[in-house]
Design a protein with these regions (language model features):
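Transmembrane beta-strands of outer-membrane beta-barrel proteins
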Residues: 43-45, 71-75, 110-112, 177-181, ...
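Outer-membrane beta-barrel translocator/receptor signature
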Residues: 5-8, 19-96, 104-108, 161
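Transmembrane beta-strands of outer-membrane beta-barrel pores
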Residues: 47-53, 79-83, 94, 116-120, ...
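Outer-membrane beta-barrel proteins
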Residues: 56, 82-88, 119-125, 135, ...
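Short loop/turn motifs that connect adjacent beta-strands in outer-membrane beta-barrel proteins
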Residues: 37-42, 66-71, 107, 172-174, ...
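Acidic/polar loop-and-plug regions of large Gram-negative outer-membrane beta-barrel proteins
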Residues: 80-84, 96-103, 107-170, 183-215, ...
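Hydrophobic, lipid-facing positions within transmembrane beta-strands of outer-membrane proteins
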Residues: 28, 41-43, 55-59, 94-98, ...
Length: 362
C-alpha cells in the first residue's frame, strides 16, 4: 500500500484485465503510478491540521543533478498523526520515497526507486454490537468514545519497504524493450481485544486475536513493443513475459479476556489465556507470457490479446502439520472493437477474461 501523496496517477481499469496484468479480479484493477524525477526543478511543502488533533506535513523536491540533464533525483516524504474517537488509540504514519532517473544514452533510460513506510499506530480495527449503539441495551446506549480493548494488549504496527527499477531502450526502428522489477517486504503485527456480545445488562464478553505476518515478494516484467504496417492496417504490438514470487508467513493467536462494563469501564485486565493456533507459510509463483496487437484501420480500432499463465501455490501449516499444493495453467484472452466518429463519440464492444488463482490450495 503506497500513500497517495507519492502517486502521480491512479487508473481504474474496469473489467477483466488478465491479458496485460496477469492474475486479477474479474471486476478490474487499480493501477498506481508513482512520482518520478523531473529535469525541471521544483518542490513543495504542505502542512495540515484538523479535528481529533490531526496534524502532518508533506514535502516533495525534484530536479537535475548535473549540467547535461542526464541525471535527475526526487525525494518525497510525509508524516501524519491523529487521535481517534477512542481515547488510547492513535493513527500515525511516516513514509519516504527517494528516486533517480539516469538518461544513460539518448535512447536508454534507467529509473531507480525506493519506498519506506511505517504505521506504528493504525487506529481502531474493532466494532460494537448493534444492540447498545444503534438501539438502546437495557435502556442505555454505549458512549461513542467507549474503548472495549486494553491498551497494553491492543497493537498495530505495519512496516513496508520496496525497491525497484525500470530500464528502457528505444531502437532507431521505433521498437523498444523494457524491464521492470520490484521487491517488496512487508511486516504487520495486529493484536486486538474485541467485544464478543453481551454477557448481561452492563457487561460485554471479550476475546483476543493476534497475528504476526511477514511477506516478501518480487515481480519482474519484460516487454517488447513496436509498430509496423501490413497494407492499410497499422499494428501496435506488445510482447511480454512476467514473473512473480510471493512468500507470506503468518502466525495466529487467539485468547480470552474478562468482560468489561460498557457503561462504566475499568481497564487493566489480564488475559484469561492466549494460545497460538497456526504458523502458516503461503507461497505463490506465477509466470506469464502475453501478446497484444492494437490494429488501426481508418476509423476502426481492433485490439486482440492473449496470455498464458503457469501458477504454483503451496500452503504449509507448521503448527498443525498440514500441507496443500496447487498447480494451474490458464489462457486469458481479450478482443475489442471501436469506431471513432468526427464528433468524438467512440462506441465500442469488448470481451475479455480474467484469471484469479486462489492463494489457498484445497
Amino acid at each position: 500500500m503506497v500513500d497517495t501523496w507519492f502517486l502521480d496517477s491512479i487508473e481504474v481499469v474496469r473489467g477483466p484485465a488478465s491479458v496485460l496484468y496477469g492474475r486479477s479480479s474479474p471486476g478490474g484493477i487499480v493501477a498506481l503510478t508513482s512520482r518520478k524525477p523531473s529535469f525541471d526543478p521544483g518542490g513543495e511543502i504542505k502542512l495540515f491540521a484538523g479535528n481529533n488533533n490531526q496534524r502532518g506535513a508533506m514535502f516533495d523536491v525534484t530536479g537535475p543533478v548535473d549540467d547535461n540533464d542526464r541525471v535527475a533525483v526526487r525525494l518525497s516524504g510525509m508524516t501524519r498523526y491523529a487521535d481517534s474517537q477512542f481515547d488510547p488509540l492513535k493513527e500515525e504514519r511516516y513514509a519516504l520515497m527517494p528516486s533517480l532517473t539516469w538518461r544513460i544514452t539518448d535512447n536508454t533510460r534507467l529509473d531507480l526507486m525506493a519506498y519506506l513506510h511505517r504505521d506504528p499506530e493504525g487506529g481502531s480495527h474493532s466494532g460494537l454490537p448493534y444492540d447498545g449503539t444503534v438501539v438502546p441495551h437495557s435502556g442505555k446506549k454505549i458512549s461513542n468514545t467507549f474503548f472495549e480493548g486494553e491498551d497494553d494488549y491492543d497493537k498495530y504496527d505495519r512496516r513496508e519497504n520496496m525497491v525497484g527499477y525500470n530500464i528502457e531502450h528505444l531502437f532507431d526502428s521505433g521498437w523498444s524493450v523494457r524491464q521492470k522489477l520490484r521487491y517488496l517486504h512487508t511486516k504487520v503485527e495486529l493484536n486486538q481485544v474485541y467485544a464478543a456480545g453481551w454477557l448481561n445488562d452492563t457487561e460485554l464478553n471479550r476475546g483476543y486475536s493476534g497475528s504476526d505476518e511477514k511477506m516478501n515478494a518480487i515481480t519482474l516484467d519484460n516487454q517488447v513493443d513496436g509498430s509496423f504496417d501490413t497494407g492499410a492496417v497499422n499494428h501496435r504490438v506488445l510482447i511480454g513475459m512476467d514473473y512473480q514470487d510471493r512468500t507470506n508467513n503468518v502466525t495466529g493467536y487467539y485468547g480470552g479476556f474478562p468482560p468489561i462494563d460498557a457503561f462504566h469501564p475499568v481497564y487493566g485486565a489480564k488475559p484469561d489465556y492466549i494460545t497460538q493456533y497456526s504458523r502458516e507459510k503461503h507461497k505463490l509463483r506465477q509466470t506469464g507470457y502475453y501478446l497484444q496487437d492494437q490494429m488501426s484501420i481508418d476509423r476502426w480500432r481492433l485490439t486482440l490479446g492473449g496470455r498464458y499463465d503457469q501458477v504454483s501455490v503451496s500452503n504449509v501449516d507448521n503448527f498443525n502439520h498440514t500441507r496443500s499444493d496447487l498447480d494451474k495453467n490458464n489462457f486469458s484472452s481479450r478482443a475489442a472493437l471501436l469506431y471513432l466518429f468526427d464528433n468524438g463519440v467512440a462506441p465500442y464492444v469488448s470481451y475479455s477474461t480474467a484469471f484469479t488463482p486462489t492463494s489457498f490450495a484445497d
